[in-house]
Amino acid sequence: MADNAGEYHDAEKHAPEQQAPPPQQPAHAAAPAQDDEPDDDIDALIEELFSEDVQEEQEDNDDAPAAGEAKAVPEELLQTDMNTGLTMSEVEERRKKYGLNQMKEELENPFLKFIMFFVGPIQFVMEMAAALAAGLRDWVDFGVICALLMLNAVVGFVQEYQAGSIVDELKKSLALKAVVIREGQVHELEANEVVPGDILKLDEGTIICADGRVVTPDVHLQVDQSAITGESLAVDKHYGDPTFASSGVKRGEGLMVVTATGDSTFVGRAASLVNAAAGGTGHFTEVLNGIGTILLVLVLLTLFCIYTAAFYRSVRLARLLEYTLAITIIGVPVGLPAVVTTTMAVGAAYLAEKQAIVQKLSAIESLAGVEVLCSDKTGTLTKNKLSLGEPFTVSGVSGDDLVLTACLAASRKRKGLDAIDKAFLKALKNYPGPRSMLTKYKVIEFQPFDPVSKKVTAYVQAPDGTRITCVKGAPLWVLKTVEEDHPIPEDVLSAYKDKVGDLASRGYRSLGVARKIEGQHWEIMGIMPCSDPPRHDTARTISEAKRLGLRVKMLTGDAVDIAKETARQLGMGTNIYNAERLGLTGGGNMPGSEVYDFVEAADGFGEVFPQHKYAVVDILQQRGYLVAMTGDGVNDAPSLKKADTGIAVEGATDAARSAADIVFLAPGLSAIIDALKTSRQIFHRMYSYVVYRIALSLHLEIFLGLWLIIRNQLLNLELVVFIAIFADVATLAIAYDNAPYSMKPVKWNLPRLWGLSTVIGIVLAIGTWITNTTMIAQGQNRGIVQNFGVQDEVLFLEISLTENWLIFVTRCNGPFWSSIPSWQLSGAVLAVDILATMFCIFGWFKGGHQTSIVAVLRIWMYSFGIFCIMAGTYYILSESAGFDRMMNGKPKESRNQRSIEDLVVALQRTSTRHEKGDA
């Protein structure tokens, strides 16, 4: 540990018990990693070692709370009697006035949410088609179109509701508890039942669930506010001092009166401001609306061409309206929103089963395209559990003596144990001597960590009655304690300091240990190195992330040396710098463009504060990257909201969860990478369906448009409607398909998407034209297939077969046989194919005019031939770099970009200096 980082508390800073976990664990909590030792052995060990002290602690807890006068505050919130608390009638009255103690969620009106499934460019076109059918008194088409619109809305609404139900169940498992005094009795309640004026009982390990004030006189609490303010050290709280929701009590016991709940708390107000800053339509919705708008324009262009041809042929108005209805139905895919929503909702439910709560469905698309993941270190890359290394002892001191002394300088209360105490107690399994001796010592007085002296002190009595003072803490501060008592031999002093420097350079935190036996001088004993080791799966996950084209940047509040050592162990890059080099505090002399280059090239930053996280995300986004950000505290909320995908990690505060797009209940980076793979699979399903559905619309627009213009013939309107229905019904099962995941981030490459869809649509149109002209000749018995039946049924079957089979082409990254479709998708397509064949054979829409089996078999053969041609075409275009260049062109480089970056950073620095000057 470096000199300036040589604080005992630095070892606690990112330790697992810094902020005690909620008393109620999620019902679906992820299983611990194989090499992570559970804390159950700690409880058993404490029971064995400190049974008398634990009993005394329990007796203390049973005492009635001490009364104390509250400090005057506005209204009557602090006038509650501290012994009796509120009455139930007062609780009900205040709950009606102030509501539940929870941040308000934007509750959507179910009816309005359902109605919104009828809003959008695609839906408007279908509604226009329904009105047109009603005007033509074509009640069959009118009913079918309305049913199609209703099916789209019902499927989308039900799927989102089911996914939301799963998320709500998981959220319930995260509920906190609160110990409240009401009507003179102590009750344990759900935290959301707390109201202003309630008296809460605080104990070591309590997570404070509302804002309030300490009301116990002469009390000394230490509260961890790192989730709110980012302060690494616990804050001292005395009578009258404010407390904030999401803080954790580290030391002491007392009472507080609740002054604010829910959205009125500091956390709630911060979350409200962050959420208010977010607005606008999601990127995915913009993509769908853009596709619908372009298809609508194509429909209008097709109708213009048809109307122009009809003008010269003097076509009747009623016939023109039929043309309009047909082209409108086939030109805009009404099922597109429903299928895509279903795909994302099913994916969200699957992610929820893997402990990832998707707050909004569009986050799935964003996560699939993430190129850079800015990850915190503690708990995500590491275990968030301290482990001890090999002790360094000075001459004449054994490792057993050092461990025994360090364990004596530990809390005797189970809830008072910090991460360092737990680490030492776990280490006793490897030190049987100190373990057997520990119970023979009696602790006379224990002084918790003092941020001034940076050490923990315990006064104990040995079995022979000798009194010993034991300390552990920041190595150089422990050394100072000994030096103030007597000079230390030069060789011991040199070896001790060298070891401190060596451990710091290797990324270890270190603790100095010393003791003073009654009647003797202080004795320096040695150093115990400790570290937060990487999770067992992190190195493998980092390697997998690289394979997936994802860059992981470490952003940590730890010292740079610690961050570098962790990065080295994980196989990450070691270009990790102090966040101060970003120059956000008004300093720094790098031009803005160089700051952008610096952030882009860095593998991470140490000694990071929330403003650094926000700046890193902003810079990467301005460079064109899609960025994901992990966080857990209130101060992380702006960064989580700023990122393209905000990720609240396990144990995150309500504010962080509210600001995030995805909330993870399972610890570690592997859960995030697994979710990323799943999101890419979901994106692939959506992308393949959109290509498929646009191609179908273009296919029918091209074929029927030319057929109307050249031949002045129109397919039966009922069959046109059923073609549209079959195209969407068959592919609803795409949500359950065995989709591959891309090995690189995926985005909506719209030029390429439209290029592929257009070419495939043209191939389909040519295939349909050839089938029609070769199988159906002018006059009886002049076609290739004799006794073929009715033209509409032949066209209907060929169009249905080739369109349904297209999904097997677009769903694969390689040849169509390279990936086996799911049984749901295969079954749905087969069922629709059989139904379409029955339509053709029995002529259900042409008064029973049947088509021969021979003709039907020939149609299947023609359709399979067309399928092979479009499969080959799609594969060639998908693998062609030239096609991509033709669709996207060369990337344009902005000459002014670096100048703009220089200006932005200069303005930020000037603003910061100005604020400092005003202060």
Swiss-Prot record:
Positions in the Cytoplasmic compartment: 1-113, 159-289, 346-717, 773-824, 876-919
UniProt topological domain (Extracellular) ranges: 135-138, 312-322, 737-752, 846-858
NCBIfam families from the UniProt entry: ATPase-IIIA_H, ATPase_P-type
Active site: D376
Gene designation per UniProt: pma1
UniProt key word Methyltransferase: no
UniProt-listed Pfam families: Cation_ATPase_N (PF00690), E1-E2_ATPase (PF00122), Hydrolase (PF00702)
Annotated protein name in UniProt: Plasma membrane ATPase 1
Keyword Ion transport: yes
Enzyme category, top tier: translocase
Compartment list: Cell membrane
Superkingdom as given in the UniProt entry: Eukaryota
